[in-house]
């Protein structure tokens, strides 16, 4: 993600972010069963968050910080990985060229972290019951600039009909104006533009396209919040997270079902997940970690902005638009409290046999050794989701007998294949 406070004089221990004790219990963190070395990844992220004294993409908007030469003497720029943010071959102008082309060795965008955000990360990691009380000030003009360059340049415009290149024409003035409005409380979120794309089954999936300024601010807020929630999310959570792509989720799933004692599998699908996220519950979950009232008001604005379809505005009482920059983080926070912590506790306290889980966004697979555990967990999952306004899709959620002798056992019982 993008960064802020590239030239902050505040040390990690002197960050303006403060915190107070909360009372939410936290389940134990699970190490993902993949081929990735978690300790090396953690050291890399620490270095990224600690990187300071540099503007976005290693450049300064003044002459104080010199441009980094192309030959970096073998030193790789430190950055936190991002997923699915490709670059276009064209650029708005030569003055914006370098910032949009700086890349890491793995091809992901170069995004240095500020000391302030490093302090947020350390505070959140040190005590997962702390509520952080001062977060909005981390959304600086520099972070907004970085967030702008994280956006897809060819993305369709929202209700403002403004493209990335339109905004780039008067970039500096507009970023400064946007920054001022955010901190004066004058920023207003625009409704999402409703559009539809076809689904594999022939039905249409609704998408919400945010206005360009809303995308910028959402990207900045996501950067700040990821410093908190990446310390909280459990090891079996994948999807729309730094370094946790679908390929790593599949790797973890393969290891889980081949190396563990798995005889039964719940293959689950949540019906209309993003369209049914409860605003009330989501804000309660966010308040477990965020005590900054201004940041909470900002996060609530995007939930209440509504949607515009064919020029007609309608309110949104539940759900968050698929396609919005902030929605994947909202979804992961929601399922962290509704599913992840619950199933992690359930398998430790109630399961008779071994239980393994891999979740990718709103899709998840749970493996069981015991059939009784699988059937009981599925029944309790339905009740758990109903409490928070969610539902397991009755046609797409399956309980599957699995394993080396599964087919033989089904044949003996006269059962049909799954």
Describe each region flagged by the PLM.
Residues 174-177, 181-196, 200, 224, ...:
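Conserved polymerase palm-domain catalytic core
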Residues 147-151, 220, 298-303:
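Short alpha-helical scaffolding segments that buttress acidic/His motifs in well-ordered protein cores
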Residues 115, 127-130, 146, 192, ...:
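Sequence-level motif detector for i,i+2 pairs with an aromatic at +2
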Residues 206-207, 211:
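Conserved phosphate-binding loops in nucleotide/dinucleotide-binding enzymes
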Residues 212-222:
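Duplex nucleic acid-engaging cores and interfaces of nucleic-acid transaction enzymes
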Residues 1-172:
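Non-catalytic, polymerase-adjacent accessory regions of viral genome-replication enzymes
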